[in-house]
Each structure stands twice: as structure tokens, then as C-alpha cells.
């Protein structure tokens, strides 16, 4: 599903390539048949935010938001286990799940990195993606709430991910 790939890209560390491709994103968003008006509005607002800031400022905000504030970590098992020994097996299980689906991870990030999780969700059909993400719903809600409380520009993106991790969407 293209929405998950788009969210994955937008939640990565901002670089010049992202800035260069910003004008293409609204067109790609228009091709996403599975987004609702609120999701589209949040995504377009975030794209406007990216376009309105210098790259160095975007990078500084990203680092401050996700790398310097543990409560906002994009490594989801960190929220569940911290540095507990149980985190390792959870990471291994997630990596094995990716391999079971034939997805080769070509990044230095751990398998629980949210942009990587969203990229994997893009390989799944709608219902599979919702079920997969629903396993992380509580963590996504905490992360979304933390970003909203901090008035982070990333709050809208996490709100979309949280909403898509709700099994009640299966009935729709």
C-alpha cells in the first residue's frame, strides 16, 4: 500500500533527496486510493511544513525529536522493553518475519524502526497491514500522544499510523 511507503519516507531523517522530491509527493498522495480526507490533510500539512523550513532546521528538529528524546524513539521495542534482555528476541522475531515474507532489509536500522516497519507494511494487503500494525497499537498511541503533547510537526504522521493500527478499520 502506497500510503505506508509514503509515511515511511516522511518519517526518515530528512535529506536533500526528500526535499528535491517534495513537489512529487502530492501527486503520489492523490494516487493513494486508500486515504481519507483527514489523512490527506495531515500529509499535505506536513509536506508544506517540510517545504517551508531549511534542511538544516528540519534535520535539527528530527534529531531533537526522535534521537534525543527517548519517549519519542522510532524504535518501537524500546518503548516496550527499554534495554531489557527481552528486546533482543523481539527484534529477532521481527527480522525473521520480514524474511518469511521475502523482504530483504538493506539498512543499518534495527527491524523495529518505524519507517522500516511501515515499508514492510507497504508489502502487505490492507487487512494484513492493519493486523500487523495492530500489534504495536499501544506503543504507536503513546508515541502519537507524546508528539502531539510536544506540538511536534510529526504528530500528524504518527496519528495516521496509529489510526491505521486499529483493527476496527477491518470492518470498514
Predicted regions and their residues:
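Charged, alpha-helix-forming regions
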Residues: 1-112, 119-172
Amino acid at each position: 500500500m502506497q500510503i505506508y511507503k509514503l509515511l515511511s519516507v516522511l518519517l526518515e531523517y530528512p535529506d536533500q533527496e526528500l526535499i528535491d522530491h517534495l513537489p512529487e509527493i502530492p501527486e503520489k498522495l492523490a494516487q493513494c486510493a486508500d486515504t481519507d480526507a483527514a489523512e490527506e490533510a495531515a500529509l499535505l500539512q506536513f509536506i508544506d511544513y517540510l517545504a517551508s523550513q531549511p534542511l538544516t532546521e528540519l534535520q535539527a528538529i528530527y534529531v531533537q525529536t526522535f534521537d534525543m528524546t527517548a519517549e519519542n524513539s522510532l524504535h518501537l521495542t524500546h518503548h516496550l522493553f527499554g534495554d531489557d534482555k527481552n528486546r533482543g528476541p523481539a527484534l529477532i522475531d521481527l527480522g525473521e518475519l520480514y524474511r518469511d515474507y521475502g523482504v530483504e532489509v538493506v539498512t543499518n536500522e534495527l527491524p523495529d524502526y518505524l519507517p522500516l516497519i511501515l515499508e514492510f507494511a507497504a508489502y502487505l494487503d490492507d487487512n494484513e497491514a492493519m493486523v500487523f500494525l495492530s500489534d504495536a497499537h499501544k506503543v504507536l498511541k503513546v508515541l502519537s500522544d507524546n508528539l502531539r503533547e510536544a506540538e511536534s510537526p510529526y504528530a500528524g504522521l504518527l496519528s495516521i499510523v496509529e489510526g491505521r493500527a486499529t483493527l476496527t478499520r477491518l470492518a470498514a
